[in-house]
C-alpha cells in the first residue's frame, strides 16, 4: 500500500531525514517511535507532501506520489491527522467534518459510521470546534480524516495531552479500522504502551534515520522500550 524508499530531506544545512525506508500494508498498524527531534513529524509531513523530499521515492497504491501535491495525495486516498489536531475553532463540529469531504460533491453526506466510532460528536454537531475538550477535538480530527474513506490513515501523536479514557477509545477505533483489512495505518507515537498495544510492525528512528524495525509482537524482546526511553 505504502512504500518509502531511501528518502532524504534537508532544512537549510541540516540533514533531517536520512535514507528512510518503510512499508505500510493494508490491515496493519505501522508504529513509528523515537525520541523528540529525530524526524518523525517531518517524515509524516513528507508523506503528505507538506515538506518536499530531496531524494528517494514514495509509492502509494503502486504509484509514485513524491512529486504530487498534498491535495492530490488526499484525493488519492490518504487521510492525515496532524500533531496538535488543527481543527477549525470557529467552525462547528459538523463543518469541521465536512472539511474532510472538501473534494467530494457538495451533496456528499457525512458517513454515519463516524458517529458510531465517535458518539460524542453526534451530540455536539452544532458546537464550535474551539469549545470542545482536547480529547473531543482529537476525535473530531480523526473523524475529519476518515470522512472521505481513506485507504491510508496517518496519525501524528494522537494521544498527546489526552485523558486516559479517550486514549482507550482512540486505540479501540484504530485497531477496529485496521482489522477490517481495507486500510493501512501509520502512527507516530511517544506513549510506548499505547504504541506496543497497537503495533503490527514498528519502526524506530534516531537522528533522522531508521535505527530498527520489526514485528510489533517483538517490541519488548527487541529492546524498543530502551531505545526510545528519554
Can you name each region flagged by the protein language model?
Residues 33-35:
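The feature captures the beta-strand-to-loop junction immediately N-terminal to the Walker
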Residues 48:
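Helix-to-loop junction immediately C-terminal to a conserved catalytic motif
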Residues 56-64, 76, 109-110, 116, ...:
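Conserved ABC transporter NBD signature motif
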Residues 64-84, 111, 123-126, 219-224:
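ABC ATPase NBD coupling module
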Residues 91, 132, 145-146:
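ABC ATPase signature
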Residues 147-151:
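A short, proline-enriched helix->beta-strand linker immediately N-terminal to the Walker B motif
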Amino acid at each position: 500500500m505504502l512504500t518509502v524508499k531511501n528518502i532524504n530531506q534537508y532544512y537549510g544545512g541540516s540533514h533531517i531525514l536520512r535514507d528512510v525506508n518503510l512499508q505500510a500494508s493494508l490491515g496493519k498498524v505501522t508504529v513509528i517511535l523515537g525520541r523528540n527531534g529525530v524526524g518523525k513529524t517531518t517524515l509524516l509531513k513528507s508523506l503528505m507532501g507538506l515538506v518536499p523530499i530531496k531524494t528517494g521515492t514514495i509509492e502509494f497504491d503502486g504509484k509514485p506520489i513524491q512529486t504530487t501535491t498534498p491535495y492530490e495525495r488526499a484525493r488519492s486516498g490518504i487521510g492525515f491527522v496532524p500533531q496538535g489536531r488543527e481543527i477549525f475553532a470557529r467552525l462547528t463540529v459538523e463543518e469541521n467534518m465536512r472539511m474532510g469531504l472538501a473534494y467530494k460533491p457538495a451533496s456528499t453526506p457525512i458517513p454515519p459510521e463516524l458517529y458510531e466510532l465517535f458518539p460524542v460528536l453526534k451530540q455536539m454537531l452544532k458546537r464550535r470546534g474551539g469549545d470542545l475538550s482536547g480529547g473531543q477535538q482529537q476525535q473530531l480530527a480523526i473523524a475529519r480524516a476518515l470522512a472521505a474513506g481513506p485507504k491510508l490513515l496517518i496519525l501524528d501523536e494522537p494521544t498527546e495531552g489526552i485523558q486516559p479514557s479517550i486514549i482507550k477509545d482512540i486505540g479501540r477505533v484504530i485497531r477496529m479500522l485496521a482489522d477490517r483489512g481495507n486500510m493501512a495505518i501509520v502512527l507516530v507515537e511517544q506513549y510506548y504502551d499505547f504504541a506496543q498495544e497497537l503495533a503490527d510492525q514498528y519502526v524506530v528512528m534516531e537522528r533522522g534515520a531508521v535505527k530498527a524495525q520489526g514485528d510489533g509482537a517483538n517490541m519488548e524482546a527487541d529492546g524498543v522500550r530502551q531505545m526510545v526511553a528519554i
